[in-house]
Amino acid sequence: MIHLTGENLKFKEIEKVINHGEQVELSTQAKENIIASRRLIDDLTEKESIVYGVTTGFGKFSDTFISSENLQQLQENLILSHSAGVGEPFSEQVVRGMMLFRANSLAKGHSGIRLETVQLLIDMLNKGVHPIIPSKGSLGASGDLAPLAHMVLVMIGKGEAYYHGDRMAGDKALSEAGLSPVKLGAKEGLALINGTQAIVSVGTLTWLRMKNLLKTADICAAMTIDSLEGILDAFQDKIFRLRPHPGHGKTAENIRRLLQDSEIIENREHKRVQDAYTLRCIPQIHGASKDAHEHIGGILNREINSTTDNPLIFPQENEVISGGNFHGQPLALPMDYMSMAIAELANVAERRIERLVNPNLNFGLPPFLIKDGGVSSGFMIAQYTAASLVSENKSLAHPASVDSIPSSANQEDHVSMGTIGARKALSILENTEKVLAIELLCASQALDYRQPRQSGSGTRKAYELVREQVPHLAEDRELASDIETVEQLIVEGRLVSELEKTIGELK
């Protein structure tokens, strides 16, 4: 059971909730905080005080006073009107992340929402009622309005949801889960949708998968170094003590461990003084992406445990203050940074693939890694596929955050586009997983030709894992299924987890 406080939700806990259905509950202190902030909202509505989003309209309508008899309708209309998203629905994991992160933010007690409303959101999460949320339509300020509105639709008995794998009307999903829709009170609709939880959810899921991707990239690179009889001098620890970026040293250590006891490298047949950059500079290239990953993780963790509402409720001071915590810019820039950091892993991997298949660069391996070249084309078109994915990544890596379009009659005249950036980062990651799968296939094929010399202790294990799934390519066959099989080995984390059982945890 994960206890939500709004202060210290951690990535390991997030993984358990999003991927494994771990149950969630509010801490005692969180409940007290929520009740205290709601008490102030109730006092203000009784006095008919003018407070943005409580007794006024929204956006450009903020100067329109709403009488007490219309406050409930105001909040329901907010959800209905803001449910304007389009496109394919977010995945179940993204939706669960949005629900979890919104509940955690509300747990801090600065949003003025009722305890029973937050509890319904948590009950939906725990029971597996997953609102259908279109993935497009957010500007990333004022928060992720459209995506979160679709989440709240189900809470009020509207919209659609998945329950036990079946798509159904929102009210039916609640009923089958033993839950009842809520009637939103003053400010509650605004409290539920004024946040950055779509950006955070997509970004966090991408970040979590990137951790596995970074280790996978090191494994693939080590296999390519092994199969190309690479020079290990460039990975000596003393080099990285002189330029101590953390990711550089971690990558170099991984490469050394993966290639330990490689007979191919110890008995090199093709002598040279130094390798090309795509081999020699792997610590600097991969390491920079690792440092980016570390930096972005800190930002995501801060945001997950923040209040991103407006206005903010300060019950101790008896204050309600309008601010800009909903603005997604603190996330939009890191999402673009993550896109570039992941794209670079694909860029360098594709160049390593080229070195493996190109007879002018691969030190005695068959052209396109096939013995009967000419009759068979081998991995020629697999490299094309990698090049296509890398080129697509370059387009996707163009920063979303440099764009802004004014909205709400120019009241909201700068927006972050952070949700677009997060979605692009996820697409780049998925493309990069495919590129690494192709490198893994090519490197395994290359290692076949280096036998009987044995590869390194780590690369040998990775090779064995691939060969358990995909046989040597002796003659042309459909490669799409091979790529997909190895991609799943990567995506499911089996490549990394099984290899770490052999050589210990990679950094």
Curated annotation (Swiss-Prot):
Annotated catalysed reactions: L-histidine = trans-urocanate + NH4(+)
CDD domains referenced in this protein's UniProt entry, alphabetically: PAL-HAL
Positions of disulphide bridges: none
Enzyme Commission number(s) from the entry: 4.3.1.3
The organism of origin for this protein: Natranaerobius thermophilus (strain ATCC BAA-1301 / DSM 18059 / JW/NM-WN-LF)
The keyword Cytoplasm appears for this protein: yes
NCBIfam families in alphabetical order: hutH, PRK09367.1
Any one biological process term the GO annotation gives: L-histidine catabolic process to glutamate and formamide
Pathway involvement of the protein, from the record: Amino-acid degradation; L-histidine degradation into L-glutamate; N-formimidoyl-L-glutamate from L-histidine: step 1/3
PTM description: Contains an active site 4-methylidene-imidazol-5-one (MIO), which is formed autocatalytically by cyclization and dehydration of residues Ala-Ser-Gly.
Subcellular location(s) of the protein: Cytoplasm
UniProt similarity note: Belongs to the PAL/histidase family.
UniProt-recorded name of the protein: Histidine ammonia-lyase
